[in-house]
């Protein structure tokens, strides 16, 4: 019925374009009232929107590989060409196609990264959501390692638990799953990595958001402990929520060269063209997708590997980010 009405409205609009002035000025018997015009137009727009969202469900596993070359001031030659793959917001509890997820992991490995970084939200609520996909994500390997951090969904805050102990156990189980997959989870801590004789720091903090409704477990000062005054040419930070960058990182930690975040998903809905990008999420997050720079500091916000809520991607595809340092 809806499609028939949409077709009839389209036919009517087409007839208006081709109508002569004589026909247009004919008796009101054949004219359409303003109310009917508005209702049919609304029906057409509604049909187009519905069709768009249905089509968007076919994009939920259509991984988009975003490649960028990022210049870091004072980067030693040994670190130039360092290739980092970032993924974020896996949300394994939303998946329904292991083959498609495995293909996404294969696409990551085809990039031959030196380092793989995951910036939080591996589940929707429960650690058990990850279990069917652990064998797939265990395939992620890189010479310098696979590192991860936590996002707001990883704490189990959005589900009713039998008791407080069950919630705590869920998080401990999830931490163990990271380790079982060969991922090193950084929770307010850092590691020193080396390539070609040059060392650099990778820091990871728990979820920290400038938005009141999201948790502030991240402790960047704690992540610095033991780092001291080492004159390292590069510091990379994993922090799930991009609002952390403006609220704390840029002003208080100017030595962090690159921050990697996720969280927004680009709202899984928007418009991306070579010359512009738009999504409703930009009215909530100043930095919501892609690269942002302020002087020598940079933030990259990944659009997410998975999906949550709406089982699709309309205009904003799931993302695998490949960053090559220069």
Show where each model-derived region lies.
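Generic detector of short, well-ordered, non-transmembrane alpha-helical segments enriched
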Residues: 33-34, 66, 181
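Soluble catalytic domains of enzymes that build or remodel membrane lipids, polysaccharides, and related
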Residues: 75-326
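Non-catalytic terminal accessory segments
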Residues: 1-61
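Alpha-helical transmembrane signal-anchor/signal-peptide segments
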Residues: 62-71
């Amino acid at each position: 019925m809806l499609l028939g009405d949409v077709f009839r409205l389209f036919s009517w609009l087409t007839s208006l374009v081709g109508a002569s002035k004589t026909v247009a000025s004919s008796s009101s018997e054949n004219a359409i009232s303003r109310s009917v015009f508005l209702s049919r137009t609304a029906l057409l727009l509604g049909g187009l929107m519905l069709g768009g969202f249905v089509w968007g469900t076919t994009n939920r596993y259509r991984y988009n590989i975003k490649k960028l070359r990022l210049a870091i001031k004072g980067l030693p030659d040994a670190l130039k060409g360092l290739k980092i793959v970032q993924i974020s917001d896996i949300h394994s509890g939303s998946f329904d196609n292991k083959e498609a997820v495995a293909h996404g992991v294969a696409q990551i490995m085809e990039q031959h990264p030196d380092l793989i970084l995951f910036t939080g939200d591996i589940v929707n609520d429960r650690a058990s959501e990850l279990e069917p996909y652990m064998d797939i994500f265990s395939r992620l390997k890189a010479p310098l390692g696979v590192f991860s951090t936590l996002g707001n969904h990883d704490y189990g805050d959005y589900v009713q638990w039998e008791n407080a102990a069950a919630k705590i156990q869920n998080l401990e189980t999830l931490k163990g799953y990271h380790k079982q997959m060969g991922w090193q989870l950084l929770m307010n801590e850092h590691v020193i990595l080396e390539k070609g004789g040059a060392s650099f720091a990778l820091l990871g903090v728990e979820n920290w958001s400038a938005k009141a409704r999201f948790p502030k477990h991240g402790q960047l000062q704690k992540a610095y402990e033991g780092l001291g005054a080492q004159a390292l040419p590069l510091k990379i930070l994993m922090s799930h929520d991009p609002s952390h960058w403006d609220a704390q990182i840029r002003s208080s930690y100017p030595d962090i060269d690159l921050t990697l975040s996720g969280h927004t998903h680009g709202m899984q809905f928007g418009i991306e063209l070579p010359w512009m990008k738009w999504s409703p999420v930009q009215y909530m997050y100043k930095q919501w997708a892609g690269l942002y720079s302020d002087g020598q500091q940079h933030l990259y916000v990944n659009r997410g590997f998975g999906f949550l809520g709406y089982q699709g991607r309309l205009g904003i595809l799931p993302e695998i980010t490949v960053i090559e340092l220069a």
